[in-house]
Design a protein with these regions (language model features):
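Active-site nucleotide/adenylate-binding loops and adjacent lid/helix of ATP-dependent enzymes
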Residues: 166-282, 332-344
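Peripheral (often C-terminal) accessory segments that flank ATP-dependent C-N-forming ligase machineries
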Residues: 405-524
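Short acidic, glycine/serine/threonine-rich loops at helix termini
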Residues: 44, 84, 152-155, 228-235, ...
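Short, flexible loop/turn elements at secondary-structure junctions
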Residues: 144-145, 223-225, 287-290, 301-305, ...
Length: 524
């Protein structure tokens, strides 16, 4: 019954859909459930993960439409000053008018459970949400869609603007590889999904035999998040088991012994914990792409409920961790030498996902390796994984779109304001230093105001901050720096870092290195 009711609700959404822009201009109630409904043992590896519910606060900018009403639910109450900060960004809308159309609700539950589960466990809260929404004028958005979000959609009788959870597999590591193959998009050699360490070693040995030149293999939990579920298997220490020097059985045994020495991308991970997740989540192995000059671009797309593919953006991602596997931030747009190729591949992948029945946002991560060529610079692009959900590049781009009311130009891969001005940005979720710990949201607002670090609505340039709730405990902050040129965006980011360092230098006798580069990766 639940599945048929959910499909009926999604069909209603398809019937009412015209376009992304016109949909937001209608008289609508938007329910925002920013739940990271991911494996909680994996998400716990991310510092301040509970505050990632703030990443969808860009949705408040939708209140610029005077007919829109919005309900935003969080696990713990949001500081009022954070809400005020976003509402003050609205161009041409009186603050009080927007605030009257915003309803904030909370579960008052800081446990590791996902926010959606917390809501479902509180039937009175569910009923209050239901009463606040207007029938036939409402829809629900979320960070990622699972069976919990589907259940909440059905209980509220509100359509969910997200893929059916039955399609979740296509956003996993193994599912991504199958979509790449269907789309004829280049991707690294790798394995099918395995469920135990013995089969993992077997798959790694077979991959090594197919590619004897490999120096490293990536081991990925099938449902890892932001690269936190990735590990590196170094092959050099077991050189005696190389394909041309040993039997297959010898190679498998050598890899099995070496698995205990995987290099994990997060300091919290151990082989004992990682190996225990393989029977629960599954895992794959994949060839590690080497290269002297290597980048990590991505493309973001949107599948309308009618199945049309829209390319939203491209980015050059900034990755960290021992082997560059952890997402830290991004530049918009991606390098001009490959951004149009990213778009073409993104459309192919979007079409394959739409054929499976997926709707709403998807992102595709790539690895780009510079190739020597007599005619100039060329880049080899290999697709790595699909995110069938909102991701780290969603909120900065949507913030840019909502604040400037501009448009993405598919012919160039650039973003233009209504006045024809090109816009660029640098964004991160991981500006994190120990000396920032103890800063309260109010303190940050004082610093923003005093040093004029705010977003200027007249020039449509400046900084937009998020993850403010993670500052006090974790010293962690997110921001999007919008400029009229790549250099201006980079300068804005560097200015914020310089000011925060100076403002907090008296709080601590030392400053640790930020996990995000102190100077973003240079634009080409």
């Amino acid at each position: 019954m639940g599945n048929s009711k959910f499909r009926q609700l999604q069909n209603n959404l398809r019937d009412r859909w015209l376009s992304v822009d016109s949909f937001d201009q209608d008289d609508r109630d938007i329910l925002v459930v920013p739940s990271l409904t991911l494996d909680q043992r994996e998400i716990k590896k991310v510092d301040g993960f509970l505050h990632y519910e703030e990443r969808l606060l860009f949705s408040l900018i939708r209140l610029r439409n005077p007919h829109t009403r919005l309900i935003y639910i969080t696990a713990q109450p949001l500081p009022p000053i954070v809400i005020d900060y976003y509402l003050q960004l609205l161009p041409g809308i009186p603050f009080s008018h927007a605030r009257d159309r915003l309803l904030l609700m909370t579960t008052y539950d800081g446990s590791l459970k996902s926010l959606t589960q917390k809501i479902l466990e509180r039937p009175r809260l569910v009923e209050r949400i239901r009463r606040a929404l207007r029938p036939d004028k409402s829809y629900m958005v979320c960070y990622n869609s699972t069976y919990l979000e589907r259940e909440l959609s059905v209980q509220l009788d509100v359509p969910l603007l997200a893929p059916d959870p039955d399609l979740l597999y296509w956003g996993t590591k193994s599912g991504s590889r199958q979509i790449f193959q269907l789309s004829d998009v280049p991707h690294p050699d790798g394995s099918e999904l395995v469920w135990n360490c013995e089969d993992l070693a077997e798959a790694a040995a077979q991959l090594w035999e197919r590619q004897p030149q490999l120096r490293r293999i990536v081991v990925k939990l099938n449902e890892g998040f932001s690269g936190e579920g990735n590990a590196i298997l170094e092959l050099n220490p077991i050189a005696q088991a190389k394909p041309e020097q040993a039997s297959h059985a010898t190679r498998v045994r050598a890899i099995q012994q070496r698995l205990e020495h995987l290099r994990f991308q997060t300091t919290y991970e151990t082989w004992k914990n990682f190996s225990s997740r393989i029977p629960e989540l599954g895992a794959i192995v994949e060839a590690f792409i080497e290269g002297e000059e290597k980048r990590s671009p991505s493309v973001q797309g949107y599948i309308t409920p009618q199945g049309k593919i829209n390319i939203l953006s491209t980015h050059d991602q900034i990755l960290g961790g021992p082997d560059g596997q952890i997402y830290l931030g991004c530049h918009f747009p991606a390098d001009e030498t490959y951004r149009l190729t990213l778009q073409e591949m993104g459309i192919k992948i979007g079409q394959a996902l739409a054929a499976k029945g997926a709707i709403e946002r998807y992102g595709v991560d790539f690895v780009a390796v510079r190739q020597p060529h007599s005619s100039g610079v060329t880049w080899d692009l290999q697709a790595i994984e699909i995110n069938l959900r909102k991701g780290g590049t969603t909120h900065p781009f949507m913030t840019l779109k909502f604040l400037t009311n501009g448009r993405y130009d598919l012919s160039t891969g650039l973003f233009h304001t209504q006045q024809g001005k090109d816009k660029y940005y640098v964004a991160t979720d991981n500006l994190q230093k120990d000396c920032y710990r103890g800063l309260m949201p109010n303190d940050l607002m004082d610093i923003i105001a005093y040093h004029k670090l705010h977003f200027d609505s007249s020039t449509r340039t400046g900084n937009i901050f998020h993850l403010m709730g993670a500052l006090s405990e974790f010293g962690k902050l997110g921001l999007t720096c919008i400029g009229n040129s790549p250099q201006q965006a980079e300068n804005l980011y560097n200015q914020v870092v310089k000011v925060l360092d100076a403002e907090t230098s008296t709080q601590s006798n030392y400053t640790t290195e930020s996990s995000y580069p102190s100077t973003p990766i240079a634009w080409s």
